[in-house]
């Protein structure tokens, strides 16, 4: 991730965060699912199932040469501890709800129901995030709340928030979830799905 001056005579980086350079690599930032929150922090999922929050500017708005990592949570490991089981899907995407809870989903672009992979959806509480950002230690065993859908169900690039909670689209259903000291399923609407479609010539479908 980098901040670049596109108006300069020569495009230069004003600040950056590079896992390969700063931490020896081993993971990538999922930049397509990253965003800037109301604190002006970059919130990003990673390829090794962590959620990071990065401070990219100082109090005057000047870019920091090296972004400061102010939060780092292994969300898959935290979810596995809460569930007491192994998750076979990786962290896909994240979103804040209107109460400041950070929702997360596991999944991918091709989740096949018949393969029975176990995934999860849930949230890190607003209180835990505030504690960590203030320099404290949060009890993630009690501040990470998880719902495990049926094996073979996982998110496929669909997560958003609204005043009522978090809307999550999986390969089998659409959910409205609400944070209530746990994951409250307000509603679940299923639809027919058999995984990726065959996209060979003449199949009349794309993808696969």
Residue locations for each model-derived region?
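Secretory-pathway ectodomains
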Residues: 1-208
């Amino acid at each position: 991730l980098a901040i670049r001056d596109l108006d300069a005579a020569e495009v230069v980086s004003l600040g950056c965060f590079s896992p390969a350079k700063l931490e020896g690599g081993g993971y990538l930032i999922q930049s397509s699912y990253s965003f800037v929150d109301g604190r002006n922090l970059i919130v990003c999922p990673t390829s090794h199932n962590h959620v990071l929050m990065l401070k990219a500017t100082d109090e005057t708005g000047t870019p920091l040469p090296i972004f400061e990592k102010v939060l780092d949570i292994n969300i898959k490991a935290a979810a596995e501890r809460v569930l007491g089981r192994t998750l076979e899907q990786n962290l896909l995407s994240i979103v804040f709800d209107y109460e400041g809870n950070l929702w997360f989903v596991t999944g991918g672009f091709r989740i096949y129901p018949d393969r029975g992979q176990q995934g999860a959806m849930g949230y890190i509480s607003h209180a835990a995030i505030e504690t960590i950002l203030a320099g404290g230690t949060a009890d993630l065993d009690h501040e990470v709340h998880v719902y495990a859908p049926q094996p073979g169900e996982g998110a496929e690039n669909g997560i958003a928030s609204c005043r009522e909670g978090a809307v999550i689209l999986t390969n089998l259903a659409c959910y409205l979830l609400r944070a209530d000291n746990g994951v409250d399923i307000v509603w679940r609407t299923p639809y027919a799905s058999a995984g990726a479609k065959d996209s060979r010539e003449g199949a009349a479908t794309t993808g696969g």
